[in-house]
Amino acid sequence: MMEDLLKNLNDEQIEAVKHNEGPCLVLAGAGSGKTKVLTNRIAYLIENGVRDYNILAITFTNKAAKEMRDRVYNLVGDVASFIGTFHSLGLRIIRENCGYLNLPSNFSIIDSDDVLTVIKKILKDMNLDTKQYS
C-alpha cells in the first residue's frame, strides 16, 4: 500500500508526503499536484499509525473538499478525518458547542439572501412598502 501512495510522485512531492517534523509548506502553481500531495499525505499518515480522527484538512470550496474526500477514500477507504471547508468546520464547532453558546441544537445559519427575505417578510407584516427599502 505504501508504494502506491508514493507512485507517480516526483521527489519533492514524496518529500512533502513523508515530512514529519514541523510545518511543511508546499508552493506550486495550479495543476501541479498540491491536492494529490495533500491527499497522499493524509493516507500516508493513516498508514503510519496516525488516527484518522486526528487529521483535519480544510479548503475554501465545497468542490475542493469533495475532491479531497474522494481521493482519500480511493487511497485508504472511509475515514473519520474532517475534510471540509472553513465554513463547515466553523459550523461543526458551533454545533458541537451550542450548549455553551446558549444556542438551540437545531439552530440555522442564514446567508445574506435569507436575511433580505426575512426583512422583506417583516416589512410586509408591518404593512410597509418593501420597495421603499430596497
Predicted segments, located by residue:
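DNA-processing P-loop NTPase/helicase core
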Residues: 29, 96-134
